[in-house]
């Protein structure tokens, strides 16, 4: 039986592999948030004082208040904290990358705006635009590249998205602002992230790189990580302020979608009426927002989102348990033991 610290010691790989990747990384396609070309002098000075590490591809990450960021991402997070002033009626969807973000963006948008598009389903925005263009990211889009957007031009309620920790987000928001958090088990999040990075960088990485990413995950060194700290921040927030933070599990939405969508609507204070339920409104939203439907739309097969990422990159299987096709039994066991240790007696359990 491995102890937790023994597990971690097994996770460290030779940095020679990372150095090798460093020499070839310039060939990879990079989104803006992974770069370091939009950082103020003040933030550059801050970065020099922060703990640093490298991700599994050799790109520098910096730990600010317990969370890992690329330089451009850190700059955007700081700008969000300084300038973002949401209205009490606005909604924020929070998640880790590849934790169910795309699906929840579509569900929240469809639930909140269902009355507006009830009579014209054939022209519903979700049929014509990628969910990420309908629900913009705060730090990845709106406040990226040192932009300070004019949020007053958006109608209420506006739906925003973020990958920030709850503590980082709370520096910019009031508790009155509704926050929906969706999370996914670490094993499927990891595997989905692996495929995402392959598609994002337009390359096919080898097994050695897969193992490097696994090691980084085990150490918590990933964008917005560690995974467990991110999840726990919102879990505890939902326990402390249930009326303002809704904690949702991807697996539960897959298992009982109707129940969870109704729960979502009630939290957002736009519950389905008896007439809506009887007329099949919930089922219509689930059909519209199904990953199968969204992934087959032309706009999501060939389009490009405003953040410069191909739309198809955000769609793959969306299945629960796909990790079994990629992780070795020892890898799966290591993840399970780390999560058991890190979540401890928090009350948060993943099946």
UniProtKB/Swiss-Prot annotation:
Enzyme Commission code(s) on record: 2.8.2.-
GO molecular function, one term: sulfotransferase activity
Coiled coil: none
Source species of the chain: Arabidopsis thaliana
A Gene Ontology term for the protein's cellular component: cytoplasm
Active-site annotation: 163 (proton acceptor)
Residues the entry annotates as binding 3'-phosphoadenylyl sulfate: 98-103, 184, 192, 250, 316-318
Family classification: Belongs to the sulfotransferase 1 family.
Function field: Sulfotransferase that utilizes 3'-phospho-5'-adenylyl sulfate (PAPS) as sulfonate donor.
UniProt name for this protein: Cytosolic sulfotransferase 11
SUPFAM superfamilies for the chain: P-loop containing nucleoside triphosphate hydrolases
Disulfide bonds: none
Enzymatic class: transferase
Keywords assigned by UniProt, alphabetized: Cytoplasm, Transferase
Protein localization: Cytoplasm
Knockout consequences: No effect on sensitivity to salicylic acid.
Main location (coarse class): cytoplasm
């Amino acid at each position: 039986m491995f102890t937790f610290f023994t597990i971690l010691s097994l996770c460290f790989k030779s940095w020679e592999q990372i150095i090798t990747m460093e020499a070839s990384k310039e060939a990879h396609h990079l989104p803006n948030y992974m770069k370091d070309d939009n950082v103020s002098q003040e933030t550059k000075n801050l970065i020099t004082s922060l703990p640093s590490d490298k991700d599994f591809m050799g790109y520098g990450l910096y730990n600010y208040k317990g969370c890992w960021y690329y330089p451009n991402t850190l700059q955007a997070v700081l700008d969000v904290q300084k300038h973002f002033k949401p209205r009490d009626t606005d909604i924020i969807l929070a998640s880790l990358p590849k934790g169910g973000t795309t699906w929840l963006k579509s569900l929240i948008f469809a639930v909140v705006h269902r009355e507006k598009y009830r009579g014209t389903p054939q022209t519903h925005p979700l049929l014509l635009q990628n969910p990420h263009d309908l629900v913009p990211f705060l730090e990845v889009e709106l406040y990226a590249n040192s932009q300070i957007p004019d949020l007053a031009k958006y109608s209420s309620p506006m739906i925003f998205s973020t990958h920030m920790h709850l503590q980082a987000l709370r520096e910019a928001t009031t508790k009155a602002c509704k926050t929906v958090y969706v999370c996914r088990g670490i094993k499927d999040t990891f595997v989905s992230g692996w495929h995402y990075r392959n598609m994002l960088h337009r390359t096919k990485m080898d097994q050695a790189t897969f193992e490097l990413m696994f090691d980084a995950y085990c150490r918590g060194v990933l964008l917005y990580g560690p995974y467990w700290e991110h999840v726990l921040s919102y879990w505890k927030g939902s326990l402390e302020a249930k009326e303002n933070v809704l904690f949702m599990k991807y697996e539960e939405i897959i298992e009982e979608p109707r129940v969870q969508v109704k729960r979502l609507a009630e939290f957002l204070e736009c519950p389905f009426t008896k007439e809506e339920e009887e007329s099949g409104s919930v089922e219509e939203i689930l059909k519209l927002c199904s990953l199968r439907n969204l992934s087959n739309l032309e706009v999501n097969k060939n389009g490009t989102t405003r953040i410069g990422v191909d739309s198809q990159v955000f769609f793959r299987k969306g299945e629960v348990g796909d990790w079994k096709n990629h992780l070795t039994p020892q890898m799966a066991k290591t993840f399970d033991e780390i999560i058991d240790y890190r979540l401890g007696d928090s009350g948060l359990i993943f099946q």
